[in-house]
């Protein structure tokens, strides 16, 4: 059974995102004093009284404005209400009832989900009761006074919300979904790609650059595996971003890379690889995340039988530090090869979580040493690689024990990394090597202990 969903609905600047952060104990939702800052619906995890649930934050609803985004924001609110068990209608207790509040109340009366009126900006219980009384006029039931900033009344509100959830299936066991972050510059088609994958208009798509300013989380199931897809704000060069909501969205995009299991780096086939694409790729490599490179807008490229191979060669030369990443050419508009993203992303995640026994690691190292001996200094001192062992996953990490790490230059280290990757068949994930100095006698003791363990 899916987690219950709580939808946050209201006009601009009544404190919806602040309440989301309070309910979910996070700072994920963008909080900034500008109408319409939240334009897509964004999901966060909540927990109260032994119940897990999802909180979906929607854009500020307005019914008397002709702005390009407002019809789309209303559509996002509709989609949120369709999946919600409870809708929280947020109003401003200090302003009182407005025409916009009345329009939203009318909008909600035809919806099937349960509705609670939440009167925000009530900074004390006594003040709150007086402010809340006016909102009975909306005809949506009892108003609940709270202060999202200070937390006043939020415990009572959560008690009521949880009471409206369906009964919990105690036998249910849910595995953590694979977290897939869709990363890229503005306007490369990330949101269109997400919509093509999900089969619904999940993120607002517009020709205006930077129209996704939050990270947008979507859960889907594909061939029995649960995925959490994160569509991030387009990431620009830092000096071109002001300290407004876009700045916070970009930083959240970097956070999405950190918490992802696999990143889909989206490149515009018409633009090719830019400096900013290289910086993004470097960030993914730095964080040690599995990665898939998606070349989007392939339908718009004039091509012949050699175009794909030539473009792949060019892209790989510019993203050489992601030479281990799989690449796929797609069109989010036509759906071409979009289905293949799951197969390659699954491969990358599985590879990043793979463990290899110490004996197999050392078989590969022994073969590598046969083909190319460690370097020797001008003074005649040669490096010695004793053995290696895997010490971590996500990404796969190996410690190599040697006589003196400084004897192994960058060229030889890259050679060993390449031999480990090819010999062990790692694809779609970076690997990390740690070079550790060790005395010969300590190595002999280690080998003796390992041999004894095998015999036992």
Swiss-Prot record:
Keywords: GTP-binding, Nucleotide-binding, Repeat, Ribosome biogenesis. One of its GO terms (biological process) is ribosome biogenesis. GTP 1 binds at residues 10-17, 57-61, 120-123. It comes from the Bacteria. Residues 4-169, 178-353 form the EngA-type G domain. GO terms for molecular function: ATP hydrolysis activity; GTP binding; ribosome binding. GTP 2 binds at residues 184-191, 231-235, 296-299. Residues 354-439 form the KH-like domain. Associates with the 50S ribosomal subunit. GTPase that plays an essential role in the late steps of ribosome biogenesis. Belongs to the TRAFAC class TrmE-Era-EngA-EngB-Septin-like GTPase superfamily. EngA (Der) GTPase family. This is GTPase Der. The gene is der.
């Amino acid at each position: 059974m899916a987690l219950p969903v709580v939808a946050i609905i209201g006009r601009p600047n009544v404190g919806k995102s602040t309440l989301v952060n309070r309910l979910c104990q996070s700072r994920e939702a963008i909080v900034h004093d500008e109408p319409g800052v939240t334009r897509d619906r964004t999901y966060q995890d909540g927990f109260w009284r032994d119940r897990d649930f999802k909180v979906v934050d929607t854009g500020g609803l307005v019914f008397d404005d002709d702005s390009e985004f407002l019809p789309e924001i209303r559509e996002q609110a509709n989609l949120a209400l369709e999946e919600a068990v409870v809708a929280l209608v947020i109003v401003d207790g200090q302003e009182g009832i407005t025409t916009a509040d009345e329009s939203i109340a009318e909008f909600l009366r035809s919806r099937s989900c349960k509705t609670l009126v939440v009167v925000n900006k009530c900074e004390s219980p006594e003040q709150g009761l007086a402010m809340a009384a006016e909102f009975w006029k909306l005809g949506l039931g009892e108003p609940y006074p709270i202060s999202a900033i200070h937390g006043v009344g939020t415990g009572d509100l959560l008690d009521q919300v949880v009471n409206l959830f369906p009964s919990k299936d105690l036998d249910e066991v849910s595995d953590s979904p694979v977290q897939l972050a869709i990363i890229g510059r503005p306007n490369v088609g990330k949101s269109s790609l997400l919509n093509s994958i999900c089969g619904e208009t999940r993120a607002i798509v517009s020709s205006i650059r930077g129209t996704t300013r939050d990270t947008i989380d979507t859960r889907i199931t594909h061939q029995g595996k649960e995925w959490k897809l994160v569509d991030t704000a387009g990431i620009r060069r830092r000096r071109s971003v002001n300290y407004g909501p876009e700045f916070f969205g970009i930083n959240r995009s970097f956070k999405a890379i950190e918490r992802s299991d696999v990143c889909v780096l989206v490149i515009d086939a018409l633009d090719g690889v830019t400096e900013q694409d290289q910086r993004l790729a470097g960030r993914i490599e730095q964080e040690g995340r599995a990665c898939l490179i998606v070349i989007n807008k392939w339908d718009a490229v004039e091509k012949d039988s050699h175009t794909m191979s030539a473009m792949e060669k060019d892209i790989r030369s510019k993203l050489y530090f992601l030479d281990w990443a799989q690449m796929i050419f797609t069109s989010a508009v036509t759906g071409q090869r979009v289905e293949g993203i799951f197969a390659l992303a699954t491969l990358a995640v599985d590879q990043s979580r793979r463990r290899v026994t110490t004996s197999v690691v050392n078989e590969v190292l022994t073969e590598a040493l046969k083909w190319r001996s460690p370097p020797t200094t001008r003074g005649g001192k040669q490096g010695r690689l004793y053995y290696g062992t895997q010490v971590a996953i996500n990404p796969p990490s190996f410690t190599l024990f040697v006589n003196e790490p400084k004897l192994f230059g960058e060229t030889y280290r890259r050679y060993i990394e390449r031999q480990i990757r090819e010999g062990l068949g790692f694809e779609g994930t970076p690997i990390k090597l740690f070079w550790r100095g060790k005395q010969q006698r300590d190595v002999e003791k280690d080998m003796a202990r390992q041999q004894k363990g095998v015999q036992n």
